[in-house]
């Protein structure tokens, strides 16, 4: 890189992916500043909160690769912009994906704004995705070359301005190679396991966590025919397609097939369950989505043949855009989709290009 080095602020979590991201950019000649985000305040002494250790890992990595690092607290922004929505969605009977909103509102908004205040031209994260500028000058979000690790689904709510200032160095690299690089350069966290759980909240038991914030009320579990087969502990604790944890594994009711959560009747506090993976109540030929966001800069045309994901790691499903306007999207699938879940994101793709999407209704 000729001339003065370009300044890039890297979101460093203490994990392997963001650590290798910082090292790669340093090798490419960037002036790298590491930024550690603390976005959750409660239960810092909990066995499930690793914030202190994550920060120590960031400091150790930064010292090894020779970059400056600082910590910033976005807990207020997270609770206001992400967690409040998370609770509203669960209260309404939907199953939200907070990682999607966290990316749009925290990692690529609050974080980006802070990075710009530090004089950075771009930011970078350890996400597995790619960005390129097309001939028309628009920026495109693409799947990672390693499709098994692709995270473009979680990034579909970014806008063109955010995308234009973002680097994803790992988008061209297989995850196995990232681990190899970490070991080769002696990163102290080279063998650290990947994080899971709710964005920034960690891996604590979800039911216990949610129960602290939402009032719950037990109610009946019914079949589509109206037969009561059990009792649920609160509708917020269940999601469509759920098989484990519904308490009917040993039930003698029905035909012996596995039970699945099929619908929630919020008005009557009733959970509907069905037997069999391919029960008609679990299959959706057409979905509607709202709260649309188009990272591509514009929506697809009605009638366009696309592919869609209705959950992370799902294989692309062939679909047609039946209708689209500023507020609503309707998708028709070539094959009915299983357990399409209100609150999750429906994300559209044209090949490897992520166009955007909306919240399933």
UniProtKB/Swiss-Prot annotation:
Gene3D superfamilies for the chain: Adenine nucleotide alpha hydrolases-like domains (2.30.30.280), HUPs (3.40.50.620), Translation factors (2.40.30.10)
Any single GO BP term: tRNA wobble position uridine thiolation
GO MF entries: ATP binding; tRNA binding; tRNA-uridine 2-sulfurtransferase activity
Major site of localization recorded for this protein: cytoplasm
Region (Interaction with target base in tRNA): 97-99
The organism's place on the tree of life at top rank: Bacteria
Family, as annotated: Belongs to the MnmA/TRMU family.
Role this protein plays: Catalyzes the 2-thiolation of uridine at the wobble position (U34) of tRNA, leading to the formation of s(2)U34.
Name this protein carries in UniProt: tRNA-specific 2-thiouridylase MnmA
Organism lineage: Bacteria, Pseudomonadati, Pseudomonadota, Betaproteobacteria, Burkholderiales
């Amino acid at each position: 890189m000729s001339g003065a080095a370009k300044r890039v602020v890297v979101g460093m979590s203490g994990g392997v992916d963001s650590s290798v991201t910082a090292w790669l950019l340093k090798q490419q000649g960037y002036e790298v500043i590491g930024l550690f985000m603390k976005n959750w305040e409660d239960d810092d002494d909990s066995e499930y909160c690793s914030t202190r250790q994550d920060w120590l890992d960031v400091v150790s990595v930064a010292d090894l690769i020779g970059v400056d690092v600082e910590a910033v607290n976005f807990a207020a922004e997270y609770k206001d912009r992400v967690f409040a929505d998370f609770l509203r969605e669960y209260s309404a009977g939907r199953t939200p994906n907070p990682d999607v909103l966290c990316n749009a509102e925290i990692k690529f908004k609050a974080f980006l704004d802070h990075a710009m205040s530090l004089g950075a031209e771009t930011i970078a994260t350890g996400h597995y995705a790619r960005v390129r500028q097309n001939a028309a000058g628009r920026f495109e979000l693409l799947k990672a070359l390693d499709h098994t690790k692709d995270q473009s689904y979680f990034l579909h709510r970014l806008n063109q301005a955010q995308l234009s200032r973002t680097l994803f160095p790992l988008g061209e690299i297989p995850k196995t190679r990232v681990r190899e690089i970490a070991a080769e350069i002696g990163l102290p966290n080279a063998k650290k396991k990947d994080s899971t759980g709710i964005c920034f909240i960690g891996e604590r038991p979800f039911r216990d966590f949610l129960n602290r914030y939402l009032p719950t009320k037990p109610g009946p579990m019914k079949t589509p025919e109206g037969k009561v087969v059990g009792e649920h502990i609160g509708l917020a604790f269940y999601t469509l397609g759920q098989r484990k944890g519904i308490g009917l594994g040993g039930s003698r009711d029905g035909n012996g097939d596995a039970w699945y959560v099929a619908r929630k009747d919020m008005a009557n506090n009733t959970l509907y369950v069905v037997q069999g993976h391919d029960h008609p109540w679990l299959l959706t030929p057409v979905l509607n989505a709202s709260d649309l966001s188009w990272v591509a800069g514009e929506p697809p045309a009605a009638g366009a043949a696309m592919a869609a994901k209705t959950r992370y790691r799902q294989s692309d499903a062939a679909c047609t855009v039946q209708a689209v306007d500023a507020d609503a999207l309707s998708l028709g699938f070539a094959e009915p989709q299983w357990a399409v879940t209100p609150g999750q994101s429906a994300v559209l793709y044209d090949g490897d290009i992520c166009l955007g999407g909306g919240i399933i209704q």
